[in-house]
Amino acid sequence: MDRNPELAIADARPSQDGRAAPSRLDDAQLAELASRIKAWGRELGFGAIGISDTDLSEAEAGLAAWLEAGCHGEMDYMAKHGMKRARPAELVAGTRRVISARLAYLPAGTLDGAPDAQGARRDWRAREAARIADPQAAVVSVYARGRDYHKVLRNRLQTLAERIEAEIGAFGHRVFTDSAPVLEVELAQKAGVGWRGKHTLLLQRDAGSFFFLGEIYVDVPLPADAQTSPDAAPETPGAHCGSCTRCLGACPTGAIVAPYRVDARRCISYLTIELHGSIPEPLRPLIGNRVYGCDDCQLVCPWNKFAQAAPVADFDVRHGLDRASLVELFEWTAEQFDERMQGSAIRRIGYERWLRNLAVGLGNALRAAPGGIGPDARAAIVAALRARLDDPCVSALVREHVEWALRAA
């Protein structure tokens, strides 16, 4: 906890400036506080703030089965904490409520778009699809093209926590931003922030799914919001995904093995970010030119026609990551990678895995259908790969993937 989790519960004394201690707030005061928290959240740019209790018992069986099947791959931290992920009060002692927040991350310019030769503006999702279809393009997931979201989200959530403290005095709390074993989608759904889509991401009617989630675990018994009706099956009354299965069909590697179930071991986001070693050879051709993460399941989702622009400039594209080529990024030195990825979520995978991912993309470019790339582009790719292979400092991991890529030369 950022502060003693027992303090606000055990201490019934008013604060020195006359504010009531959190444990002394009556129902009306708690309701007013919840309303203010949501207003403060809007001021901080959050698209939605919701409050839930800590009962996630309905998620425990599914979590246990998913872990038992090994679908978490090398993400051992998911199994390490066991059922604490589904038991907020065990993860952070004293927790009574969870505040869930949603922050849009699409760069503002993305939704505006650039006019084509005829002056028409293409839907931004069509532009993203066009880059994925270009064998020479390096595709970085939209969320990772700007500043590291962990920092942006954490700072805003901490500011929100400080506003609460200024209102009621010291209270037990802890901020989470995809940095601990938290079932954030279940918590957000329970708090009425959205519903779990078949791709397992949270969806919201007026915002789609291109947003981050963050939480504040608190020891204050705020009134809980009504849960968003889950889409458990197409025939469920009020279902929000209905019979749509576009995300399942769009997944390049078939990682969405069933509605609401992802096998991370096949997911491109896992393979390019979480996996430390060699990417399984049968999956490499399916990755295409996606070098950090994957947005395919979101791009085809009908709800994302309502995706919102980020309220902050932190997520604006840096270093041309929305238009860079595979060769361009592959030729970065280790020093250039460290310098340019400073403050980016990409930096955490390190230079070695960055090159590994790019080598796979270059190999897939060489394997593109006839006419996919011209002879000059092909020659440039081969030259870049061979230059890396000639580097005596190249790691065994990178060398393996470069050699695989060159087998298509």
Swiss-Prot record:
Q: List the disulfide bonds.
A: none
**Start and end of every 4Fe-4S ferredoxin-type domain?**
232-261
| This protein's encoding gene | queG
As for family, the record states: Belongs to the QueG family.
Protein name (database record): Epoxyqueuosine reductase
Q: Which domain of life is it from?
A: Bacteria
Q: Which SUPFAM superfamilies does this entry report, sorted A to Z?
A: alpha-helical ferredoxin
**What organism is the protein native to?**
Burkholderia pseudomallei (strain K96243)
List the Gene Ontology MF annotations in alphabetical order. 4 iron, 4 sulfur cluster binding; epoxyqueuosine reductase activity; metal ion binding
Active site residues of this protein: D178 (proton donor)
Q: What is the lineage of its organism?
A: Bacteria, Pseudomonadati, Pseudomonadota, Betaproteobacteria, Burkholderiales
**Per the UniProt entry, what are the Gene Ontology biological process annotations, in alphabetical order?**
queuosine biosynthetic process; tRNA modification
In which residues is [4Fe-4S] cluster 2 bound?
Answer: C251, C267, C294, C297
Q: Which residues cross the membrane?
A: none
Major enzyme class: oxidoreductase
GO CC field: cytoplasm
> Which positions are annotated as binding [4Fe-4S] cluster 1?
C241, C244, C247, C301
Cofactor needs:
cob(II)alamin; [4Fe-4S] cluster
> What is the protein's quaternary organization?
Monomer.
Q: Which InterPro entries match?
A: 4Fe4S_Fe-S-bd (IPR017896), 4Fe4S_Fe_S_CS (IPR017900), QueG (IPR004453), QueG_DUF1730 (IPR013542)
Task: Tell me the pathway.
Answer: tRNA modification; tRNA-queuosine biosynthesis
* Enzyme Commission number(s): 1.17.99.6
Q: What's its job? A: Catalyzes the conversion of epoxyqueuosine (oQ) to queuosine (Q), which is a hypermodified base found in the wobble positions of tRNA(Asp), tRNA(Asn), tRNA(His) and tRNA(Tyr).
Q: Which reaction does it catalyse?
A: epoxyqueuosine(34) in tRNA + AH2 = queuosine(34) in tRNA + A + H2O
Q: Which UniProt keywords apply?
A: 4Fe-4S, Cytoplasm, Iron, Iron-sulfur, Metal-binding, Oxidoreductase, Queuosine biosynthesis, tRNA processing
Annotated spans, Disordered: 1-23
The answer to whether the entry has keyword Phosphoprotein is: no
